[in-house]
């Protein structure tokens, strides 16, 4: 969406982050989901603590915001797996990689139902 031409005032018309959610939450979810195998409940609890206090340096997110973007993350993560199954090699940054030729093994027809059901119980 950032490739859509800017409006007359030079402002970006559409931002990906507005559609998929805050990148800092997605980064938090993907790291702990992949690196530690945390369940939605554990991800929610950890995010709640990490993004709870408005006095901290991280942006504050309410419980409802965290739940909403956790659902979006899980739905999109599982729905987009087929794209990762045919990707060329890419760089590995840190201790987590989504390269199908490296660390990550996941069927391209996996379903997010179990994970989304757990999100609904939060």
Language model features: what each stretch is:
Residues 1-122:
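ATP/NTP-dependent adenylation/nucleotidyl-transfer catalytic domains that generate, transfer
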